[in-house]
């Protein structure tokens, strides 16, 4: 979504590869808020990532007819940082999470999956493409640069497909190169296992149908 928005603003970027076939974006809600379906969002506070992730959320709420300016009939949008604190501290009823990362941070913080309700954008029909590889359009006029990008995309997709087939080994490579020591084997292996579900089915080509779905979701 942010790439489309940038293009609309006049930034001449083009997609040269789309490793991710499916969306990992979801809303994770506390069950004790009484939320059982999207219609229960009214009157609730929802943490939303910006930097492009707000576009599918706002489109989703528009489709549901739910205002995003607060009030008992709408939702209050909390501009969420890239953490899960608003849910853990009960500042928000729902927060944005990725299937492969922040959701598991909530679980690792001691919250049982049974105490959560999850709404995957993919299941709600409002999924948009994520994590493509982009370049400035003018650069592609350079034959040498174009050749470099062809080889780069081929190598990248070869790596993604290897990681799909060998998630634990891929996670171990990340751990071996973690200079901070902050990453854990459990989290990295779990992340790669979930990411493999999102890259599955992609050969790196931008599927026109997926592109059109993204555009229609945002309109």
Locate the predicted segments by residue:
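Short, glycine-/small- and polar/acidic-enriched structural segments
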Residues: 1-89, 93-100, 119-121, 126-127
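Sec/Tat-exported extracytoplasmic proteins
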Residues: 7, 31, 45, 50, ...
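A bilobed periplasmic-binding-protein/Venus flytrap-type ligand-binding module shared by bacterial periplasmic
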Residues: 25-35, 129-146
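Active-site-proximal catalytic alpha-helix in oxidoreductases
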Residues: 96-97, 126-137, 153-157
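Short, catalytically relevant binding-site loops at active-site mouths
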Residues: 101-102, 123-126, 139-141, 159
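Extracytoplasmic/periplasmic substrate-binding proteins
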Residues: 105-123, 127-128
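Secondary-structure end/capping motifs
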Residues: 141-219
